[in-house]
Amino acid sequence: MRRRLLALQRLAAGLKKKWLDWSGRSGQTYFLDRVAEYREMWHAAAIALGGDFTSLADDLWQVELGSVRTRMHIHQTEFDNPAVLELAGKKAAVHRLLGAAGLAVPRYAVFSLADLEPAYLFQQSHPEGCVVKPANGYGGQGVTTHVQSRTEVRKAAILASLYDMELLIEAQVPGESYRLLVLEGRMVHAVCRRGPRLKGDGASTIRQLIVADNTRRREDGESELDMDRDCLFTLAYQGLTPDTIVDGGTSFILRSVNDTARKYAEVRTVYNETVTGLVCDSIRHDAERAARLVGSDFLGVDVITRDPAVPLQVSGGVINEVNTTPALHHHYEPRARFPEMALLVLKAILRRKAVAMAAGKEG
């Protein structure tokens, strides 16, 4: 009876998801919605490099430089082999691989919709909050954060199961999200999803500061802030509560998610600040080591930390995910002709192909 009920709830969640996606109300922007953006990006990078750009299909392009050519499908390039791509997509396997090498990863458990007991037990041992996600996936699809009860575990598992039958539950890690781009073994760029911040005035409680800021937000037509779980969790790891009076001029983070209109389910990570120079050598080396362990020459290493200037072991931060074929639209300003990273990637691919061609001729 219980399994039948879960199956019906999963069916209802799937139909709702399809309706929201079809109607454009899901709040999700997928790669198919960025075809024109990536076409312009790769075209501009090819021209800057002195190459020829050709459209093979609406979402498939070719760049030639002399006798060397490469192709890309939206954000996907010719880096990495299928085995590496498959490994990187298996989150539990990556956690085990990185954890065994001494890198910081989240505490986690693997479970399925057919057997929720491991997830229930894990949540009970992490009452401050958990994250439930499909064991394979990208872009926040099927992910629910700040899970704090059995009912929420079940609901989050149903959503995650729409994307994969193997599921993960992880301890919620305090901090902000960072994406470190590793190209050919070297970290070349980093961005951060900065959460909204407020400044204390030495007289008002945080609760009062939020009320005042929401007045401004209403006047400006912005989404209001509220004291939800993300807010309370974020304040708590800074040693704050809604009733704390913060010293005048002291800034504090109010929440980890910068999209105040969305809550905990399928929140897209929108990086809004370049922080390459803020990442300490220890975290930089961790990201580069993660890429070597996965075997990827082009990897996005996702880190959660309170402070990128100190090692993860000091801040309690983690490497929470790795992404092959990392999306370059995270790594440039919209007003730029193309991300400098696109040029670096294109140069690297063409150079590798030229070397391979030369080796083939010599052989």
Predicted regions and their residues:
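C-terminal active-site "lid" helix and adjoining low-complexity regulatory extension at the edge
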Residues: 245, 265-281, 292-298, 305-363
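ATP-binding N-terminal substructure of ATP-dependent carboxylate-amine bond-forming enzymes
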Residues: 1-87, 93-96, 114-117
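Hydrophobic faces of well-ordered beta-strands that scaffold small-molecule active sites
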Residues: 132, 167, 299-301, 320
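A long amphipathic alpha-helix within ATP-dependent nucleotide-binding catalytic cores
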Residues: 163, 214-309
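Short glycine-/small-residue-rich flexible loop motifs, especially phosphate/cofactor-binding loops
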Residues: 43, 95, 120, 232, ...
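Active-site nucleotide/adenylate-binding loops and adjacent lid/helix of ATP-dependent enzymes
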Residues: 64, 69-75, 79-229, 280-281
